[in-house]
Amino acid sequence: MALYLRLPATAGFNIDNELIIINAFNANEPEQSLHGKDVNIIASGPSIQQLPLTELLDTPTIFVNGSISLIGQHQFTDIAGYVISDARFINHQPEILQQYYTGQPLYATLAVFEAMATTHPDIMRTYHHAMRVLYPVDRPWGVKSNKLSFNKLIFKKKLLNKKIPLSYFINNPNFIIDSDHKAADIGVSLNITHGFVEAGTVAYVAAQLAFSRQAASIHLYGIDLLNSKQPRFYENKNNSAPSMLSKVLNERIVPSFNLLGRIYQSHGVPVVNHSPISKSLFDTF
């Protein structure tokens, strides 16, 4: 039997000589349950601009990266979460957190929180109780920033930085791993208390979070994919961050979402892609 790395239950960050503790996500926490409600995940594709958002405002909603800026124009009544999985977002769009984050449930990787400890220390101090750490199962540290070197996390990073092949988790009951996929192994988590599987887009992380929190159905908006060279709805041509989606679209993102849709449907949780741009790419939802 494989011995799996025990993920830390908390992470401590040294911010101006003050220890800030953030708990890891645990699906058994009562406040994490979505109580069998339908959940919308709103990504950042340009199609969001054509979305009738007024029809979605009362449904539990999980935002990712810059889509949280929608709360500046629309009154969402049930913000179920905000997910950031790549620290590069923090460095490229720091003003979004500063302007729109006011203590909503935030789920992010260690690398993201370490970036925030440097760029947004006041936010970390004020709202750390509303934050939860998510661990990528194959590299628990997460996607680090290219631009800055951070050293705020207090425990040693060596084990968490080690890349682990997904095939290592093939017999772990918390994951479904497809090792027959020709490009590279893909997978999906059934409970991200034990880690999430990456697929090249933060929306994939958010979908695993929604399932782990007992959503009845998962509705995806703004996952456009095919027009990834266009600015996100909150960007313009002058400030748009580079997108890696086109590079991994057919090899990783689409097969992973098809696996996720198939597995979650088999557990009674349908996944629906509402993007008019990418809907035709998927064969399971």
Question: Which residue stretches match the model-derived regions?
Answer:
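Metal-ion/cofactor- or nucleotide/acyl-coenzyme-handling active-site neighborhoods
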Residues: 1-285
